[in-house]
Regions:
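A compositional/biophysical signature of low hydrophobicity enriched in polar/charged and small residues
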Residues: 1-92
Length: 92
């Protein structure tokens, strides 16, 4: 399973319609409005890393009223998950 976060900038006043259009794309598992440089963050999941770009460009990119997007692929490494489960030591 491959996943990525996509930071999306929209035309002013179109945040809501872009949000709803993205939300109904089957590969989108999360969508959240943001305050700041980007209007939305969307999380997508697919079976393979090589299809992440297709979903970002051909599905989300064609939603309309998007001025820019940045895709951030997630690196899923089971050893990383194991390390993160270890409690952090306090630093003195």
């Amino acid at each position: 399973m491959a996943s990525a976060y996509i930071l999306i900038k929209t035309l002013p006043g179109h945040e809501r319609d872009v949000y709803y259009k993205c939300f109904y794309i089957p590969e989108v598992c999360e969508a959240h409005p943001l305050v700041g440089e980007y209007s939305l963050i969307v999380k997508i999941k697919t079976d393979a890393y090589d299809t992440l770009g297709y979903i970002a460009a051909d599905k989300i990119g064609k939603v309309g009223n998007i001025t820019a997007a940045e895709i951030l692929p997630v690196l899923d490494d089971s050893s990383m998950h194991q390390r993160l489960e270890t409690p952090l030591q306090s630093v003195h």
